[in-house]
Amino acid sequence: ILTQVIIPPQTIEKGVVGLQVVEGFVSDIKIQGAPRGDIAMIRRYANRLLEKGPLDAKDLEHVMLTLNDLPGVVARSVLSASVDQPGGSDVTIIVESDELYNVSWALNNRGTRYMGPMVFSADAQLNSALKLNEAIRVGIATAPDGHVDREMDFLSLSYKQPVGPYGTTLEGGFSTALSSPGYTLSQFDINGRAENYVLRAEHPVIRTRNKDLRVSLQFDALNSHRTDNIN
């Protein structure tokens, strides 16, 4: 996107004009702003542009989108001509801190007769609270119809950490659920408990404004048990 075609000083003979193509490239990366996260990680992401040679729009787009995928990061880029390298351009990346946390909650009556129908859920995420560009998430859900003897309680915890300069993330999570179905199943005094452990690695293969293709590898471990009075 920085390539230029210029007409150098010359004598035109027989109607033939010589053109000179100057392939534009990134000569320097500058980071501005005081993000809450790991500035060294942000620079490693941005330095990928120095490895590309002639700058391609899709390479710049990929770097900026993966930067903005980092929890707590809002980044934009500005291009300017290099003062000492012909054909070179400096890329200034202006980084700001996004919200420290995000919270959402919901209350609906779309549960089942056995666990519901009223269901309350809430999620909270801390963005780079440890200044590592990490995401820490907590989620809860409950079916409060039975009040003290609730029909369902759920809790989840997860930690996601970017690794390397290419948008790869590693995530570990834990969730636990307690269930005591009501309605016609209440006579069987069913009580269940389940614990789930998750390890997940994810990498963006294609990252553009219009396309997002990721590959992931996930390991799950489930431990569950149930008690009842069914003979």
Where are the language model's segments positioned?
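Transmembrane beta-strand segments of outer-membrane beta-barrel domains in Gram-negative
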Residues: 102, 162, 167-231
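Residue-level signature of outer-membrane beta-barrel architecture
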Residues: 95, 126-128, 161, 203-205
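Hydrophobic, lipid-facing positions within transmembrane beta-strands of outer-membrane proteins
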Residues: 89, 118-122, 153-157, 195-199
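Membrane-proximal, glycine/serine-rich, low-complexity loop/turn segments characteristic
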Residues: 110-114, 127-129
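Periplasmic polypeptide-binding modules associated with outer-membrane biogenesis and secretion
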Residues: 1-111, 140-153
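Transmembrane beta-barrel strands of outer-membrane/channel proteins
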Residues: 79-81, 105-109, 122, 136-142, ...
